[in-house]
Amino acid sequence: VSFEGLIQADSYWYSDDRTILSSDAVDGVDTDFGMRRAEIILKGKGPGMWNWVLGYDARSDKFLDANVQYKFNGETSITVGQYKQPNSLEELSSTKNNDFISKAMTTNMQGMSRRMGAKIETQKANWGATASYFGNEITNNESPSLGSGDGYGLRGYYAPMNSEGSILHLGLSYIDMEARTALDQSWARLRVRPDADQSNQRLIDTGDLKDADRLKTTGLEGGFVRGPFKLQAE
């Protein structure tokens, strides 16, 4: 059994030009200070080809990865429980590897994070593929559209260059899910904070799209690394 932890605090200074972005008047009208996350993660291996993980964020009061996995060999595995869904290279990347204080706005608005479900995944030296069927998140998600509703996801990637200091990554993903709110309403709504995850304001917000049926997202992703230079886009 191994133990991991991550504590992060953020400080924001805004230059407001449309609306007040601060979420806490005590911090000031153009600043926010506070604990961003306090993650505790337990991981275990065995017996045999079994693995498990249990993660919790005390700051957000929600479960993170919470699943068991069986590896058929060094390449193919089945996972049951809560895990990140197969979409968005940036969303799938660990928080500790983020390049900036916040993920890109398109990732935060459209990327699917953790849901309960089952997936099969294979990873070769230069390519990989994942298929997943999922339900709701363990902890109710504040996102009106991305925390509830059954669906499925597919993702594949190819890395013709994959060595230390030299990487070329190309990927394609697809998510198809029910448009459901936490109250089981058939609504959809996409919104995103302004590159500052502690702000309560959403500068991009579709509002409630009522009588919605499904949300379908197709993702294209690419990444290039050469020595100290990195380029990534989705």
What name fits each language-model region?
Residues 2-180:
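Outer membrane beta-barrel
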Residues 148-234:
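Surface-exposed beta-loop-beta
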